[in-house]
């Protein structure tokens, strides 16, 4: 997608990417760093997408638009991100439902799966790794729980703690779902983006579009690089979380009442 909102087809040809309609195949892009305990790194410009359904896994989509199965997963995946700080060894991080609990998994550049914990509370959506500047949670995996409204921090040793209560409406298809950290160098020339998924017959049916919150509006709301933005699935009610010695939570924005937000909050970060 261009800055003007023009969409260009990608990975649509033979050998490209396709998945079933209905599930939530979140995606991420990994960095170029060497993965701990390996002799490899993730391929440049490769997208990694969750494959829900009967054979859960991760699909790798190369810059040439070709897709291949990259890893198998032991449970139903609910979120994916890449470790950019190195506290998780620069691996892919995935949350997956397993029976009554959630597993947090690290996947290396060879597609091997390493459990971090198999007893985490429910978490899903736009999970993200906190930058080192994010107080005592720097480098932790941050994940929302839509049913309770809690924001969790998962440490590399598998410990899970509550970072904050969102203070927003909570419940299935209502509560906190999407998260993203404002990048270094973010300024008036940047923006935040969030998918508004079409979900027919839902209380929040969505518009099958991409929402944009301009940089000047975020700056006016007191948002700074390194802050965490979190939005609810229903209506994209948005908070900013700032953590230093302690954490603060402020409400800053909302989408339309019909908005059905899903996935990561993504950014363009140029200063203006």
List the model feature ranges, each with a label.
Residues 1-272:
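Sequence/structural signature of beta-propeller domains
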């Amino acid at each position: 997608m261009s800055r003007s909102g023009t969409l260009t087809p990608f990975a649509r040809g033979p050998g490209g990417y396709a998945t079933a309609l209905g599930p939530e195949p979140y995606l991420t892009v990994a960095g170029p760093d060497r993965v701990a305990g390996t002799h490899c790194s993730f391929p440049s410009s490769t997208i990694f997408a969750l494959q829900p359904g009967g054979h859960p896994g991760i699909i790798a989509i190369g810059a040439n638009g070709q897709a291949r199965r990259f890893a198998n997963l032991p449970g139903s995946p609910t979120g994916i991100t890449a470790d950019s700080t190195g506290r998780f060894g620069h691996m892919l991080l995935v949350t997956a439902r397993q029976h009554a609990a959630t597993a947090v998994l690290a996947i290396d550049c060879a597609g091997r799966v390493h459990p971090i914990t198999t007893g985490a509370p429910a978490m899903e959506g736009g999970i993200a790794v906190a930058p080192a500047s994010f107080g005592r949670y720097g480098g932790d995996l941050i994940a929302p729980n839509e049913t309770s409204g809690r924001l969790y921090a998962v440490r590399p040793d598998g410990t899970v703690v509550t970072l904050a209560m969102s203070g927003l409406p909570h419940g299935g298809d209502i509560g906190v779902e999407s998260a993203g950290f404002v990048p270094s160098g973010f300024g008036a020339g940047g923006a935040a983006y969030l998918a508004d998924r079409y979900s027919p017959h839902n209380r929040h049916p969505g518009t099958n579009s991409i929402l944009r919150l301009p940089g000047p509006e975020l700056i006016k709301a007191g948002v700074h690089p390194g802050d965490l933005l979190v939005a609810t699935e229903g209506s994209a009610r948005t908070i900013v979380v700032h953590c230093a010695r302690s954490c603060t939570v402020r409400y800053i924005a909302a989408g339309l009442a019909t908005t059905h937000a899903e996935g990561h909050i993504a950014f363009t970060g140029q200063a203006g």
